[in-house]
């Protein structure tokens, strides 16, 4: 009997080979469906693939952890369909081998955040369309670089913020606000939750299945650290085979070296919805002042950097105030009386919206009933929804519609619902929140020039030095 544990052990051992033999390229899919490769096969990658598998042929998997990434994904049974058979995807440990294949149409980039920009740009340079998980980038500099690449190489590029497809909450909020039913929006409160803390995490042997040097990528070369205990995460309830505390796997989110804590983890969702709902879609729609004085971190900081390197270091409590030239104030906070979600306060009323829930007087009066299918399609950049079902009232359907939107744009043209230009504005605000919080002061931003002004130290956080061999590509 093949148990899940035995399958993972065998598959993980096989996947330890650095590079797999490159298969003979096929000019087109045997099934007529697009061919997709997933670069990054952790929890988010597998979640995305569970929806893509209904729409495309998944022909390649790549992950630097042969056990947790590759083997877990093979267990899920995704692959190329031949009648009733499923042909397993080819597996790789180096994403460059995937990009060399001329029979792959698109790639899913579901790696940790510090790898997004390099892989996404190189994928577009190789002629691939890209579905890049959120947050878009690691730094402000990367925002501009990836936007330039999308426009230069002309590939379809979708950011993995599926909340724009939530028909039962966020889309209704956008229709209300864009329709002027709340009047002029004066105040927005964005509750994204605070980051977890960790104990001191000891040095540990690097797992045999993990290429630690490759996982670190552009980030500084540091020791692998991990706790002895194993733990579940929201995305990995069945994969409790990795440490509860470490630098990688799900826990990379809580280190500024690789991510931005909740500012980028949930900020990429809720800040995005706040801006999108108000129709603020261009980088020059951004704030002019970001106040980070009310923020706390779990470890000591000096000059914006953690003074210890063996504990989670992203902000646990915060109220980051973004002030706009027109008087709008947006508070990005870890906690609010309304809970996780977005509160919009206008001159005519207010609503609070989160995943699967929207409340306010207008909602009680039944305003959502007046919105028609064409209103939702307009929010979807004119791209029709999947013809397979009219039920878009669940989160599951929203995840699917977001992937369908990407594939439809590849096949028929059009601007994806989560396009790069609007997401640069979102990512700018996410990173500015982190910089202001790390320095604990007010910083000023020039939205038109996309730069921090009057503060050389804060401006130095706009970019990072990449480790030799992992530099960002030229565009």
Per-segment meaning from a language model:
Residues 1-132, 141-156:
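N-terminal glycine-/serine-/threonine-rich beta1-alpha1-beta2 phosphate-ribose binding loop
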Residues 8, 49, 96-99, 108, ...:
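Non-transmembrane alpha-helical segments in soluble domains
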Residues 15, 56, 128, 147-150, ...:
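A generic secondary-structure signal for well-formed alpha-helical elements
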Residues 40, 181-199, 211-213, 217-225, ...:
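NAD(P)-dependent dehydrogenases' Rossmann-like dinucleotide-binding region
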Residues 48, 62-70, 76, 266, ...:
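Glycine-enriched catalytic-core subsegment of oxygenase/oxidase enzymes
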Residues 129-131, 137-217:
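A contiguous active-site-proximal alpha/beta segment in oxidoreductase catalytic domains
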Residues 189-243, 362, 463-465:
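Core domains of carbohydrate- and sulfate-ester-processing enzymes
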Residues 213-326:
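Rossmann-like dinucleotide-binding domain that binds NAD(P)(H)
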């Amino acid at each position: 009997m093949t148990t899940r544990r035995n399958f993972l052990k065998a598959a993980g051992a096989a996947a330890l080979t650095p590079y797999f033999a490159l298969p003979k390229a096929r000019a087109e899919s045997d099934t007529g469906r697009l061919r997709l490769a997933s670069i990054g096969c952790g929890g988010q990658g597998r979640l995305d693939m569970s929806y893509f598998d209904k729409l495309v042929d998944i022909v390649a998997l790549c992950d630097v952890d042969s056990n947790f990434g590759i083997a877990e994904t093979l267990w899920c049974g995704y692959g190329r369909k031949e009648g009733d058979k499923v042909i397993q995807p080819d597996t790789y440990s180096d994403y460059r081998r995937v990009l060399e294949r001329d029979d792959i149409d698109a790639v899913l980039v579901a790696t940790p955040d510090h790898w997004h920009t390099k892989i996404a740009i190189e994928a577009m340079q190789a002629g691939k369309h890209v579905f890049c998980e959120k947050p878009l980038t690691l730094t402000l500099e990367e925002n501009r670089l990836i936007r330039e690449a999308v426009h230069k190489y002309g590939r379809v590029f979708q950011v993995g913020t599926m909340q724009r497809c939530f028909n039962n909450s966020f889309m209704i909020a956008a229709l209300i606000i864009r329709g002027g039913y709340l009047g002029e929006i004066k105040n927005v409160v964005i509750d994204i939750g605070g980051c977890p803390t960790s104990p001191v995490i000891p040095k540990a042997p690097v797992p045999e299945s993990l290429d630690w040097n490759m996982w670190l990528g552009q980030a500084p070369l540091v020791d692998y650290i991990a706790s002895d205990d194993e733990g579940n995460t929201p995305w990995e309830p069945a994969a409790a085979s990795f440490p509860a505390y470490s630098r990688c796997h799900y826990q990379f989110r809580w280190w500024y070296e690789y991510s931005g804590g909740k500012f980028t983890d949930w900020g990429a969702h809720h800040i995005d919805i706040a801006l999108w709902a108000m129709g603020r879609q261009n980088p020059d729609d951004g704030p002019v002042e970001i106040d980070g004085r009310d923020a706390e971190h779990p470890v000591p900081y000096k000059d914006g950097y953690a003074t210890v390197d063996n504990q989670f270091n992203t902000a646990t409590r915060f109220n980051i105030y973004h002030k706009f030239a027109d008087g709008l104030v947006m508070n990005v906070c870890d906690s609010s009386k309304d809970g996780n979600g977005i509160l919009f306060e206008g001159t005519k009323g207010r609503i609070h919206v989160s995943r699967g829930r929207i409340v306010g007087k207008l909602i009680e009066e039944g305003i959502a009933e007046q919105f028609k299918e064409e209103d939702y399609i307009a929010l979807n950049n004119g791209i029709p929804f999947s013809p397979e079902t009219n039920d878009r009232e669940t989160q599951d359907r929203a995840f699917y519609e977001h992937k369908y939107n990407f594939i439809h744009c590849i096949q028929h043209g059009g601007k994806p619902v989560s396009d790069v230009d609007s997401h640069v504005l979102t990512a700018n605000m996410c990173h500015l929140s982190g910089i202001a919080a790390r320095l604990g002061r007010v910083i000023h931003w020039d939205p038109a020039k996309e730069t921090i002004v009057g503060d050389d130290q804060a401006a130095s956080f706009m970019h990072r030095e990449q480790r030799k061999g992992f530099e960002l590509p030229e565009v």
